Amino acid sequence: MNRSFATTAATLALAALATGAWAQKTELLVYTALETDQLKAYTESFQKTNPNIDLRFVRDSTGVITAKVLAEKANPQADVILGVSATSVAIFAAEGMLAPYSPVGFAALNPMYSDSKRPPYWVGQDVYAAVVCYNTVEGAKKGIPKPESWADLTKPVYKGQVTMPNPASSGTGFLDVSGWLQSMGEAGGWKFMDQLDANIAQYTHSGSKPCRQAGAGEFVVGISFDFRGNDVKQKGAPVELVFPKEGLGWDIEASAIMKNSKKMDAAKKLMDWVATKEANEAYSKNFAIVSHPDVKPSLPHIPADLEKRLVKNDFAWAATHRDAILAEWQKRYAAKTEK
């Protein structure tokens, strides 16, 4: 009787311990620039295989997240960086803030879209590229033609009808500016931006906002990025998406572990998920180019040859010169930024 009672008590105690261990959750603080309409699906996908890890997001535009991470360098708060531009994440790596880690399944990914070091300091998820959203109804009403090139947007007919993101606050804005400087040369890039600025009505803090503005008819043209352009058109706005013939600036949504994280095991689990085929299938619902070569996105309003339209992009150059580029841009054009 006593032995049976003792055995039962021990069994119950072990069960209670096991239940407690199972129920105990780890919370990761994740800094992200992902769109809010992407985070829910990504979180659900991750937690299917990691139910004991909760993700608490601090979400803002790329420029704000970049400034926040750098400001916290002496006392980092985040455990993981998720979906922030590779140009910014490369800066964090150069500042010694990241932990190198090769996720399970990393070898299957396209090496072109992740850090070249082994083990990598950051892992790419997908490519996002410049797009011009043109409102066909407002364009016809105002006699403003659909542009076909970046050069077209400097013509007088577009004066006061173009919006684009401020590169200091928006990763989309920075990929535009970096792409122009790299493809046109620095002198040519600044000359182009001087001419474009004459037609700009407003610089926004969001990469999505210019396309939404064009979709709503607030302005005829919005310089944005492919995900938001496809989304706005898919929802029925009267927009045509233009992929300027000179080539498209682009960046990579990248993820990394902060070196000082005290939850390294959970952080590695999140990075393992980032590299999975399942995660890439989730990205492919939003982007036309993802890191896993076996995942073939097909978005209705994005050209199948998008990859061929991308300009050459030196991420190391962009990361090294980012501060100087932004300082010069702010000096020349910031007066038109929305309040």
Located regions from the model:
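Extracellular/periplasmic bilobal clamshell ligand-binding domains
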Residues: P300-K339
